[in-house]
Each structure stands twice: as C-alpha cells, then as structure tokens.
C-alpha cells in the first residue's frame, strides 16, 4: 500500500526559487496600486512621529552603491519605526544647484556658457537636473524605498528658493554674513571659489625649495656682521606663490641661529632647532653657529626679495612650528589664511598676483601671463641662476584638488561673501550636546570641525545657483540687504523662480521708492552677480523643505556618509543656529562609511572594480542589496563585490527555505485555533521562548541601528534553532500525526507564531520577501493581510515562555543531543546504521544529572530522531548505538516491536484507522 497518501505532505504556492529580479517589480506595482506609503501613514496617524529628513543627493549621474547603501539604510529605519507604532513621513529630496551640473552639461552638450544668456544656460541646467532626478528616483523606488515620490523637495524649486532667501536674510540681519577680501580655495579651471567640503586631497609630486632672502635692513642690530653675506632661509612647496611674498614669519619665542658656511662665508638665519637638518639639505658640511637670538629680536627687519625689486618684512606668528622647514615661514597674504591674518595685523596691503584663470598678473614681473604650474620651473631656474636657491628636493605631498574637475586648486584672496562662523561657534557646539550621535564619537568630530573651521565662504562665481539676494547702492556703493529687500526677493522667487533675478532690473525687484538704508539715496541699485554655495542650499533644507513644507522641526534623524560631518550635517547645523538660534535641526545624527570593493579599495573606472546597483537588481534582486546594507557594520567602510553578493544570496536562501518549510506545513492551519500554552509540549514552548529572546534582541538592535546584529541573529535562529534542531525534530509530528491531532496543531502553533514573527521582524530589511511570505501565510482578523509593513512587529509571547530552570534543563539536553549525534555519525560511518531511525540508543547519564534522569525515553527518542532510547542512570555520560530492534514502519520509518499485520507501528496504525477512505 502507498502510505504517502496518509501523510500530511507539505504543500504551498510559495516557490523555493526566489526569482527576485522578476518578482520584485511586480510587487512594486502592487505597492503603488495600493498606495502603500499613504496607507502606512494612515495606520499610524496620530501616533508619535519619527521623521528621517532625507539628505538630498546631487541630481547628477545615475545610481551608485553609495546611493544604494544610504537609501537602503534609511528605508530600513523608517519601516522599522512604522512597524513599531510611529508616524513616519519620508519626503525624498534632491540638491540641484552647483558646478557639477554646469560642468556636465558643458561637456555633454558642448555648450559655451559665456556665449549663452544666463537664463538659457540656467534652463539647460534645470532640464539636466530634472532628467537625473527621474533616473535616480526610479533607482530608489527599485530598492523598495517607501516615500512621497509624488512630492519630493528640490532645492531648485521656486518655493524652496523663496524660503532659502529668508535663511540668508536672517543670518545677514544678525551680522553673520559679510563681504571681504581674504584667501579662499579657488579652482582656476572652473573659475570659482570652493568650500572646504568641495575639496579632495591627493598625493602629488612637487619640488620643495629652500630660498635665501638677503638681509636688507637689520635695524642696526647686526652691524657687527657683514650684511652682504647674511640671508634668511625660507622653505616652501608652492614656488609660484613667491612673487606674492610680503613677509617672513618667525616664532617670537623660539631661538634662531646665525649659521656661517665655513666654506664660502655666507651666513644663514634659521631656527636653532632645525640647523642640523637645514644644513644637511643644503649640503653644507662645515658650518659654525655664530650667535643666536629669539625670534622677536628680528621683528620689523627687512629682507630683500630673491628675484623681484621689493623687500619682505620680518613678522612674528605663534603658528610657526619647528617640525619642518627652516622656522622662517614664507608669508604671502594673497595665498594663505594665516599669511593674510598676520599681514593684516601688521597693517600690510593685500597683494594677489594671480588672476581668476590662475595666471600671474603684472605684479609678478616677467612671469605675467603664465599659469601657476607653468611658472614653477621658470622661477626655480631663475633662482638657481641668481644664486638665491639654497636647496631643493623632490617630494610627494597631499595637495587639495577640486572635487568636480579633479584638478589642483590654489588658495587665493578674492572678494567673496562669508558667513562669520566665529560669531556663533559656541552656540553651534552647545547644540551638539542635545543630539544623539551614532557612532558616539560623532559629537567630538563635529565639535572639533566647528571649532577649527575658518569663516564659511558662501559665494560662488557660477550661474547655476541661487543668486545672493544683495543689492548695491549706486550712490554710496554699499551692499544692501534688509527685511524689505528679502521679502521682495522671496516673493519674486516664489512666483517666478530665481531666473527672474537675472532677467529683471534691480528697480523692478525692489519696492517702489526704496531708499538705501546707508545713505538714504534712491537713485539706483545693482544686483550681486555671485550665487550661493550649494552647501548653503542643502544646509537650508531643514527650514525650506522640512519646517515650511512638512510642518515639523527638528527632524528626528539625519543619516548620511562620514563626509557629511564637514558637509550637510555641518551646514545644516550652522544655518539652524545662525539663522534661528533654535539648536540643531536633528535629534539624532547617524553616519555610515564609504562603499569600497571586496579588497577595501575605492571603486574607480580605471580599476574596473565598480559594482553597479542595476546589476544587483538584475542578477540578485533588491532584497539582496538591502541584505548587504543591513549585514555590514556600516559605521566602517562597506565592502561590495560579486563574491559578497553571492554569499549573501546563500544566506538569503537559508532564510527563504526555512520560511517555505513553515509555510508548507501551515497550509491547513487556522490561526484562530492556537494551542494554549498549558496544552503544548515543552519542546514547542522551548521554541517560542527562544523566539521571545530573538524578538527582544531584534527590538533592541533596531533601537540601536545595529542591523548587522539583526541579520546575524535571524540567520542563526533559522539555521541553528530551527533547521538544525526544532524543524528536524517535529517533521515526524507534522507529517505522521493525524492532521487535526493536538500534537500536530501544537507544532503548527509554534510554527505560525515563529513565521509571523520572522516575517515582521525581518520585513524592514527583506521588504519584498517578507511581504511575499506574509501574502502566503494564514491570518487572523486582527492582521492587515494586504502587506506585512502595515502590521506592528510581534511582542514576546510571554504566556508560552518557559522559566529559566526549564530552559537551562533544555540547554543541557541539547548538549547531550550533540553527543548522541556524534555517536550516530560514527555508527553511520562504520556502516552500523544508515538513517538515524535505524538506530536504538543506549544512553548512560550520571546519577546527579537530574535534567536527564527524569526524561521520558520515548520523548528522548523523538528528540534524537531515533527509534528507541534506553536510559541508564549511574556512571559517566556514555552513548551506545545499535541497530534498531523490531520492524520498520512503512509509514514513519520508525522501528517497532509491536507492529500490526501491515507492519505499521501502533501510532501510525491508529492514525490510518481513522482514514478509511484512503485505504
């Protein structure tokens, strides 16, 4: 007889093969049709809010792995809070203005920016930004990110621009914004100032020089020496800045030596601490220290410039160090922040002998018209010929490059608009104390950056940006920015967008009869031509998008990459504190690392080591990408490679197939008829107690944003607790007990509670798969069967929980089971048995082993998946395996000493007796 018909064979429509690349787009369509995002908001309407404010990606280029990591983490967090009873609006946004888009359209469309009208050029930029918003949006949706995709915020939208103008106006009114001539990062390839966040450092080769500046006027202090033989020796890595030298800085308290070259009689003034090093570099083998003086001894002396007809003043500065160079610091106020401040303190005029295009001006004499990098070898050769070069070396140093064009930049003084961060640094640092930083060291990093930063250069010499809303009086020439002008500009931008600034005259923007607040005249005004730094745009999103449009402030969370400590986190904090004095615009600040290849290297086209998210979607599925984001300790750099995704796919299959097994065995289960705890075997309650532990661990890990702990815990639960132990044991109950027996229904109850819990716990991470599981499983009337995310995560099932003593007993039993399994493997290898049901086990336990001594041998046989267990108390733990006695039951394969006429064991005979229609 075929007893297969009498067995509860597992069956479900849930497929073993995931087919995610094909299945996920179908699920996305279903989510869209049911308006899942808004349904989720309705579910939690009126409950406490969790608001993750989206840091806007730049609308330039297609989706990359950095985007994928960032958006996956955000969606995991938002979903996890939504499934724990929080109202979770998520409004995606984009950062649109800035040089990257200008550079891209000039290159792609071969546009001549200077030959086009400003309005036409800006329109082309707008269209380009819109194009990539669409491309990126589709990629983010493909990941499964839930959000208000119909109403994203964009920094180029008129409404946003109107509110950003108000942020500028508020900071200007407080005196935090000013225009000044001071050194800034300058990209002469793109002809614009740059913020610190727009700088990347690369190792570049360079020639470093030690240059002699002959003594010109010693103020009568060194008349006993031959002045014609005496020189200050400076050191620099930027030869091209030497035409801009106005001073030599010494430390006031350090000792400076006058060193005589015993071979030629020349004398050099260098820091005493660096004499040996400098003489070695200059290959001066025979020298004598003639005398020493503190740095302040030389103040206001004059040295002769080595190749231009001018002098250089000796000044004092505390920043001069003794760890490199000569202790005599080349000082060019047009090319350095410290240089600028020092020369300003001495009342010296600003000199900037390099123009916007990076070429020397006429101030540089014979070098006029040369690009700075072209002038380096020429100046070097001229100094050699003039005898002013003391020494030179070839080194590799870290040098700033433009983040967009990747070319070296210079530090150059130009008229720019600045935000005086010094004016509110203390308030900004204090605001950090009210923020939860993840990782915890974030607060120190942010405070350090704020304390050490210079004033923020917020102006750009670009066309595609928000115009700086400042006018200039034609009579007195002073800048004009008042409440009245800000209101007028904001209203104009709200109605017509910021293009109107370039298309309208100042008189048509300002209120009729407007008079200059400085001189009272109203003869005429001109408009500022510079645009705002893109970081000011994105730094204003907390007000322009979040507070104004979304109606809440501050955000619960900002979550971005590590680079945003000097980028969006900082610009948002500075505008919030500077404009409104309301503290940080976020309660929590979470950061993730960079995405790198499998070997930890940055991904570059030249290395061919990049990973495209689209390839992951098409080959593995978005759930595997989400699992990748969740499985990594994302606070460090996150590795990605095909091998990593293949391994993750294997882990995914373990989860999927474990859930499939449970679904298979729940096909006839009605969850309204759960087995009560008091009617449930201890093994089933043991599983639910372990499930309770998992629930608590996952809950805490979601709170801590430690998703890799969740993925590890769920994987371990599926592999170790379920597949390797519980599911293996209960197969006999599920398949061979009567379909509606108490024993089978109890196991199904445990499976149902477990599957429901796993689907909910893991739904924020495996959004597609857990929803697929949810759709395939049975539900109660309290469930929202439409989508798993519309349900709250399960809380521990305390009614089923075992006490600590019972759990300890079962941990011991599991240890013994491991020993039994080892003995079974040895017997199988020795050909004593085949399947474990072909074995009888003789188990000896110590007399004091109260946990095992009281166990029912029949229950132990089920636990060990053998036909029989004989238990002996007394002696060391020992396991003996023998061939099972009796007859093999053709239905359950257990061996029985009392089979019926058909060979069925008593249990199977009883089950089959109640199935006459199958016989």
Name each region found by the language model.
Residues 42-103, 234-241, 315-342, 346, ...:
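N-terminal catalytic cores of NTP/NDP-binding nucleotidyl/phosphoryl-transfer enzymes
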Residues 44, 48-55, 65-69, 73, ...:
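Secondary-structure capping and boundary motifs in well-ordered enzyme cores
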Residues 191, 461, 477, 520, ...:
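Cys/His-coordinated zinc-binding microdomains
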Residues 187, 402, 473, 516-519, ...:
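Short cysteine-rich clusters marking metal-coordination/redox-active sites
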Residues 247, 254-328, 337, 341:
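Protease-associated
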Residues 2-13, 17-20, 26, 30-34, ...:
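Residue patterns forming the tRNA-binding/recognition surfaces of aminoacyl-tRNA synthetases
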Residues 95, 184, 188, 194-200, ...:
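Acidic, turn-prone loop/beta-hairpin segments
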Residues 313, 318, 346-358, 462-464, ...:
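Alpha-helical recognition segments enriched in aromatics with Gly/Pro capping
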């Amino acid at each position: 007889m075929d007893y297969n018909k009498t067995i509860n064979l597992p069956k479900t429509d849930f497929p073993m093969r995931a087919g995610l690349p094909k299945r996920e787009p179908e699920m996305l369509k279903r989510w869209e049709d049911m308006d899942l995002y808004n349904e989720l908001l309705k579910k939690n309407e009126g409950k406490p809010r969790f608001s993750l404010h989206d840091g806007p990606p730049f609308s330039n280029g297609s989706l990359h792995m950095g985007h994928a990591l960032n958006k996956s983490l955000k969606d995991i967090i938002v979903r996890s809070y939504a499934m724990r009873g929080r109202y979770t609006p998520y409004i995606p946004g984009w950062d649109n203005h800035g040089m990257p888009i200008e550079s891209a359209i000039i290159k792609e469309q071969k546009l001549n920016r200077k030959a086009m009208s400003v309005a036409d050029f800006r329109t082309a930029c707008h269209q380009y930004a819109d194009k990539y918003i669409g491309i990126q949006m589709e990629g983010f949706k493909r990941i499964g990110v839930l959000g208000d995709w119909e109403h994203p915020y964009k920094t180029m939208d008129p409404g946003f621009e109107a509110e950003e103008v108000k942020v500028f106006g508020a900071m200007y009114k407080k005196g935090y914004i000013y225009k000044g001539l001071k050194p800034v990062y300058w990209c002469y390839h793109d002809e614009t100032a740059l913020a610190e966040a727009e700088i990347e450092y690369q190792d570049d080769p360079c020639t470093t020089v030690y240059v002699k500046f002959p003594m010109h006027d010693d103020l009568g202090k060194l008349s006993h020496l031959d002045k014609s033989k005496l020189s200050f020796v400076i050191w620099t890595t930027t030869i091209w800045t030497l035409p801009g030298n106005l001073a030599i800085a010494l430390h006031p308290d350090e000792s400076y030596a006058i060193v005589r070259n015993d071979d030629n009689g020349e004398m050099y003034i260098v820091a005493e601490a660096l004499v040996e090093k400098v003489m070695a570099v200059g290959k001066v083998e025979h020298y004598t220290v003639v005398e020493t003086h503190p740095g302040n001894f030389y103040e206001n002396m004059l040295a002769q410039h080595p190749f231009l007809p001018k002098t250089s003043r000796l000044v004092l500065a505390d920043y001069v160090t003794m760890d490199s160079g000569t202790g005599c610091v080349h000082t060019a106020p047009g090319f350095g922040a410290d240089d600028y401040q020092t020369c300003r303190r001495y009342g010296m005029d600003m000199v900037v002998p390099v123009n916007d295009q990076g070429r020397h001006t006429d101030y540089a004499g014979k070098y006029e018209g040369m690009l700075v990098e072209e002038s380096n070898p020429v100046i070097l050769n001229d100094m050699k010929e003039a005898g002013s070069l003391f020494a030179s070396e070839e080194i590799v140093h870290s040098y700033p490059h433009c983040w967009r064009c990747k070319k070296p930049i210079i530090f150059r003084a130009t008229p720019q608009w600045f935000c005086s961060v010094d004016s509110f640094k203390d308030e900004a640092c204090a605001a950090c104390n009210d923020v939860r930083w993840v990782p915890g060291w974030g607060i120190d990093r942010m405070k350090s950056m704020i304390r050490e930063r210079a004033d923020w250069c917020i102006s750009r010499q670009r066309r595609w940006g928000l115009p700086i809303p400042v006018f200039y009086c034609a009579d007195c020439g002073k800048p004009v920015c008042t409440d009245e002008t800000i209101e007028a500009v904001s209203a104009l931008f709200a109605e017509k967008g910021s293009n109107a600034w370039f298309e309208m005259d100042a008189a048509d923007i300002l209120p009729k009869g407007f008079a200059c607040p400085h001189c009272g005249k109203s003869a005429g005004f001109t408009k500022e031509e510079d645009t705002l730094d893109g970081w000011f745009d994105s730094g204003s999103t907390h007000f322009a998008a979040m507070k104004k449009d979304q109606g809440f402030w501050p955000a619960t969370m900002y979550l971005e990459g590590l680079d945003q400590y000097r980028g969006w986190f900082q610009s948002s904090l500075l505008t919030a504190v500077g404009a409104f004095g309301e503290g940080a615009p976020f309660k929590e600040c979470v950061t993730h690392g960079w995405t790198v290849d499998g070997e930890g290297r940055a991904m570059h086209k030249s290395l061919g080591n990049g990973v495209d998210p689209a390839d992951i979607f098409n080959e593995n599925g978005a759930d595997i990408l989400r699992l990748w984001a969740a499985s990594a300790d994302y606070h460090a750099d996150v590795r990605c490679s095909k091998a990593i995704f293949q391994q993750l796919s294997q882990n995914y299959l373990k989860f999927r197939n474990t859930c499939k097994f449970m679904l298979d065995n729940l096909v006839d289960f009605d969850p309204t008829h759960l087995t009560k705890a008091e009617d449930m075997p201890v093994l089933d309650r043991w599983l639910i107690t372990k499930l309770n532990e998992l629930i608590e661990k996952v809950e805490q890990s979601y709170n801590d944003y430690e998703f890799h702990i969740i993925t590890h815990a769920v994987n371990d639960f599926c592999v170790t607790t379920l597949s390797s132990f519980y599911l293996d044991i209960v197969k006999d109950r599920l398949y061979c007990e009567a379909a509606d027996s108490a024993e089978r229904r109890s196991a199904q109850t445990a499976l149902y509670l477990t599957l429901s819990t796993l689907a909910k716990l893991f739904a924020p991470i495996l959004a597609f798969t857990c929803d697929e599981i949810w759709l395939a499983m049975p539900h109660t009337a309290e469930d929202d069967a439409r989508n798993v995310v519309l349900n709250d995560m399960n809380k521990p099932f305390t009614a089923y929980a075992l006490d600590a003593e019972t759990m300890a007993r079962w941990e011991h039993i599991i240890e013994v089971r491991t020993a039994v399994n080892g003995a079974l493997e040895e017997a199988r290898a020795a050909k004593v048995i085949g399947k474990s049901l072909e074995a009888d086990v003789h188990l000896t336990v110590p007399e004091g082993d109260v946990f095992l001594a009281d166990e029912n041998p029949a229950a132990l046989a089920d636990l060990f998946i053998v036909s029989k267990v004989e238990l002996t108390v007394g002696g060391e733990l020992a396991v003996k395996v023998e061939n099972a006695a009796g007859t093999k039951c053709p239905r359950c394969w257990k061996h029985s000493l009392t089979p019926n006429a058909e060979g069925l064991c008593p249990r199977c005979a009883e089950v089959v007796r109640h199935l006459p229609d199958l016989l």
